[in-house]
UniProtKB/Swiss-Prot annotation:
<dbReference type="GO" id="GO:0005741">
    <property type="term" value="C:mitochondrial outer membrane"/>
</dbReference>
<protein>
    <recommendedName>
        <fullName>Uncharacterized protein YGR266W</fullName>
    </recommendedName>
</protein>
<dbReference type="InterPro" id="IPR018946">
    <property type="entry name" value="PhoD-like_MPP"/>
</dbReference>
<dbReference type="GO" id="GO:0005739">
    <property type="term" value="C:mitochondrion"/>
</dbReference>
<dbReference type="GO" id="GO:0005628">
    <property type="term" value="C:prospore membrane"/>
</dbReference>
<dbReference type="GO" id="GO:0016020">
    <property type="term" value="C:membrane"/>
</dbReference>
<dbReference type="GO" id="GO:0005886">
    <property type="term" value="C:plasma membrane"/>
</dbReference>
<dbReference type="Pfam" id="PF19050">
    <property type="entry name" value="PhoD_2"/>
</dbReference>
<dbReference type="InterPro" id="IPR038607">
    <property type="entry name" value="PhoD-like_sf"/>
</dbReference>
<dbReference type="InterPro" id="IPR043904">
    <property type="entry name" value="PhoD_2-like"/>
</dbReference>
Length: 701
């Protein structure tokens, strides 16, 4: 094929500009057509095998009406032009199978999954594909070379809360994603939870709504789930996913709570996804209510139906035994299955994910929702299964990176005083009046009558119920990273603002007479982060769609953002990456927290330097020592002659470069973002055993 025919000018900025207009509104009725393809194509990444040099993934298409097996053909060729005018382009088709049949309003719904298994080359490749002969401009994705680590996106909170006034948000950050994808070539998009907001099940499942509004606790806790209720819940999740994943269509509880995210749907077809789920994929707070409420029949049904459709739409597998999809559901090699007993509420094993993203890059997505209870996120057995798999996979990854998807931030300010207040007996009279609807009706939730915000606090790793488990998890991550010389970076969302938490080797202070040994150790920690075996960043990117919290919340978090001693050798704090406003001029007091909509990407330094546009935009080179912060056309990262302060990091050949893309102005349809950047150095040393003396809540000697 001639190069000019292959390298077309795919220009998302021009093609999808009109798709952003009206993203603060939606049609009154569902956009799902009565027949034909009603959802998809949706791409999913399974794994990259750099020994066998194979790329594995899947495409899902959903059809309504008559059974009609769509055909997906593809072309595989180079992603970038070379000196050759004629290039080799291979053509074939993806093998598909019907893996699930469903019913929506008496119509048959057919789920088709197509296996992607492609050879990797010594250069990055582009795949263009067509569905039943139709090749849209965005029907394409990129396969890295077998020597290349992937460019990835991390995002969360992909939807609005029920009563948000969406008229305040004229832009779509998914438009920004597509514009950058044109020249960055993202190989994977990591969904950190809340890919869909399902809280409106309370509005659209009548029997569930009536049950939730029941004031009599005895009646509420003893209600049996009827077949009609089950069917309403099932129909809700199926239609809700088809509306959102097929058309970006959603409406909430007020006339001003509407959105149509068309660019999200296009992103599903051009960037393969790896997803874990969180509470809003089910219903707000699921797993963080008391055990007696979680075990009510109606709430068990909600969790189990949400799980079924999460698996179908986000993982492209069927959890139903009658579909015969057992291999994909339980035996596919990307899964790390949890405790054999399964979840107490959902009744299934947790599905954490391990995938390779490059010869020196892997990802671990922890399923922190399926097993979740008020007092436990994972069982001991599940942790042992996770660590066994991770150690087996990364034992030869020295100098590489492990990205850990952890939906809820783990390096985040403590709000214990709020937990104490919300559970205090002092509030009992107000809670009673609120439950009865006499006073402050929104003060308590309609589930179990707890204070409305308590489930959010109970979800957090720093909640009093989870502190021990949190510290155990961080300790294990530090131990494994140090043992194998792997830099671990945690990717989180959930909190509707951006931040960068940090664990690092302790800087010794407050010595009346600082010993020479301590001074040398401090110098090493500051000047050689590549040798800091305790260094773990927690990149928090949230929300790509939902509304950010008010300025007062960012101010509160900044005041609570103190230096903590995780153990005697590890400090925990946050990186002041947001020292300037998005205009690049005005200073921010809340330097560790940015309460604007955002998403993030993680680019290997080698890829960055080989990309002319990225290299020009970011303006860094190997050997630079930079202070994390804002990058604009007029302003690059501040560079230092020496690494003489704790918040500066080197740009290294084996490192990563993470950018949090923060929305400039939510009222503008151009959806422009501003970049806040941080280099993440690789780990060049190992340590067989770390000391964790002084760690709280664990008996470590």
């Amino acid at each position: 094929m001639h190069a000019t025919n292959w390298f077309d000018d795919w220009n998302p900025e021009a093609l999808y500009r009109d798709d952003v207009t009206g993203c603060d509104d939606c049609s009154e009725t569902s956009p799902i057509p009565k027949s034909g393809i009603i959802c998809g194509p949706i791409l999913r990444l399974i794994n990259m095998d750099f020994k066998e040099k194979t790329y594995e993934g899947s495409i899902m298409v959903v059809v309504r009406g008559e059974e009609n097996f769509p055909k997906i053909t593809y072309q595989l060729g180079p992603s970038l032009p070379s000196e050759d005018e004629d290039i080799e382009v291979n053509e074939a088709f993806f093998e598909g199978k019907l893996f699930h049949k469903d019913i929506l309003k008496d119509d048959n719904i057919w789920f088709y999954r197509y296996e992607i298994k492609l050879p990797m080359s010594n250069y990055e490749q582009m795949v263009k594909y067509a569905v039943d002969g139709t090749m849209e401009p965005h029907y394409r994705f990129f396969v890295p070379s077998f020597t290349q680590n992937s460019n990835v996106i991390s995002y969360s909170c992909n939807g609005f809360s029920l009563s948000v006034d969406t008229s305040k948000f004229k832009g779509s950050l998914w438009y920004d994603v597509l514009k950058k994808h044109r020249y960055v070539h993202y190989h994977a998009i990591l969904g950190g939870g809340d890919q869909i907001y399902s809280d409106n099940i309370k509005l659209h499942a009548p029997n569930l709504k009536a049950w939730l509004e029941t004031k009599d606790p005895i009646k509420k806790y003893n209600t049996q789930t009827t077949e009609e209720t089950k069917e309403q819940i099932r129909q809700f999740y199926l239609e809700h996913y088809l509306n959102w994943y097929g058309y970006g269509h959603w409406y909430g509880s007020t006339p001003k709570s509407k959105t149509t995210q068309k660019c999200f749907v296009k992103s599903l077809a051009c960037i393969p996804a790896i997803n874990v789920w969180d509470d809003h994929d089910i219903i707000d707070g699921y797993g963080s209510y008391n055990d007696s409420f979680m075990k009510t029949e109606n709430f068990l049904t909600v969790g189990r139906m949400a799980y079924r459709y999460y698996m179908l739409f986000q993982q492209h597998v069927s959890a139903s035994k009658q579909d015969g999809d057992e291999y994909a559901y339980l035996k596919s090699k990307q899964w790390i299955l949890g405790n054999e007993k399964g979840s107490s509420y959902i009744g299934e094993r947790s599905h954490s994910i391990f995938s390779w993203l490059g010869p020196k890059m892997a990802m671990l997505g922890l399923d922190c929702r399926t097993e979740r209870k008020l007092h436990e996120i994972f069982s001991e057995r599940s942790y042992s299964l996770i660590w066994e798999r991770v150690e087996r996979e990364i034992k030869n990854l020295k100098g590489g990176h492990l990205l850990l998807m952890l939906g809820i931030p783990i390096a985040y300010p403590r709000l214990v005083w709020l937990e104490w207040l919300f559970t205090s007996k002092l509030l009992a009279p107000i809670k009673y009046l609120s439950k009865k609807g006499i006073f402050a009706s929104g003060f308590v939730n309609e589930f179990n009558g707890d204070v409305e915000l308590l489930d959010d606090l109970n979800d957090h790793w720093c909640a009093r119920h989870h502190k021990k488990e949190r510290n155990y998890l961080i300790m294990k991550l530090q131990d494994i990273g140090a043992k194998y010389g792997v830099r671990i970076t945690i990717l989180s969302g959930d909190v509707h603002l951006a931040s960068v938490g940090r664990f690092r080797a302790k800087i010794h202070r407050h010595h009346l007479i600082m010993s020479e040994e301590k001074e040398k150790e401090n110098t090493r920690i500051i000047e050689e982060p590549t040798k800091d075996v305790r260094l773990i960043f927690n990149i928090i990117a949230s929300a790509i769609v939902n509304t950010p919290p008010p300025d007062a919340m960012a101010t509160l978090l900044q005041k609570r953002c103190r230096l903590h001693h995780f153990d005697l050798e590890t400090d925990e704090d946050a990186v002041p990456i947001f020292a300037k406003e998005v205009d690049g001029v005005h200073k921010r007091k809340e330097s560790c927290f940015m309460n604007k909509r955002n998403w993030s990407d993680i680019i290997p330094i080698e890829n960055l330097l080989n990309n002319p546009q990225l290299s020009k935009e970011l303006g860094v080179k190997v050997g630079d020592i930079v202070i994390p912060g804002i990058i604009t056309e007029q302003q690059k990262l501040q560079k230092l002659e020496n690494d003489d302060q704790i918040n500066s990091y080197p740009v290294t050949s084996g490192g990563l470069f993470t950018t949090i893309h923060v929305e400039r102005d939510a009222n503008q349809t151009n959806s422009q973002t501003v970049s806040y950047c941080l280099p993440i150095p690789e780990l060049t040393v190992t340590c067989e055993r770390l000391s964790h003396k002084g760690i709280k809540h664990l008996n470590i000697t």
